């Protein structure tokens, strides 16, 4: 691939780069993000345990992402499953006041271990996206909290980002109502 001056979109933000990056979009079957990076000329791949629904199986690696994290990537964007870590699931973690559901806790710790594979990956640029986690999970401190309404979508959903080697996102189109 030839090197071209491109505009790199990092989750909606514009960064000018003069490189073609090797990009892994983990836990993404829709290919919405990978298509944006491909359109900018990057060597981008989605990976998920599900088949892709975005129409480009040639850009999709169906299977476990773990071995891929040992490869060289310039950027990893990960959307790990949040089912057992999210604060919204606290009612299931504590079915009775003061009592933790052991099965749910074990699944939460498995989910944390999977999350940490991305967080600790040997890659210069990493973004991990997830909703607000329960404190009991013990995830590393987030880098930033964003809301869809800060970027032109009329929704409220507190989203946490863990960033490595990337700038914080700046709101681009704040909706007030």
Task: Describe these PLM feature segments.
Residues 2-4:
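Extreme N-terminal basic, low-complexity initiation segments
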Residues 7-177:
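Conserved active-site and SAM-binding loop architecture
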């Amino acid at each position: 691939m030839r090197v071209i001056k491109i505009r790199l979109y990092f989750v909606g933000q514009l960064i000018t780069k003069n490189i073609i990056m090797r990009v892994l979009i983990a836990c993404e079957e829709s290919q919405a993000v990978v298509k944006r990076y491909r359109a900018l000329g990057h060597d981008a791949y989605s990976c998920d345990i599900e088949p892709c629904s975005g129409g480009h199986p040639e850009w999709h690696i169906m299977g476990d992402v773990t071995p891929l994290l040992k490869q060289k990537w310039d950027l990893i964007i990960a959307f790990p499953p949040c089912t057992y870590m999210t604060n919204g699931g606290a009612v299931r973690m504590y079915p009775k006041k003061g009592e933790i559901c052991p099965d749910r806790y074990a699944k939460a710790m498995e989910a944390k271990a999977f999350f940490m594979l991305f967080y600790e990956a040997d890659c210069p640029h990493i973004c991990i996206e997830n909703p607000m986690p329960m404190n009991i999970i013990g995830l590393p401190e987030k880098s930033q909290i964003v809301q869809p309404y800060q970027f032109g979508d009329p929704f409220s959903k507190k989203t946490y980002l863990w960033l490595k080697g990337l700038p914080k996102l700046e709101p681009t189109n704040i909706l007030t109502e």
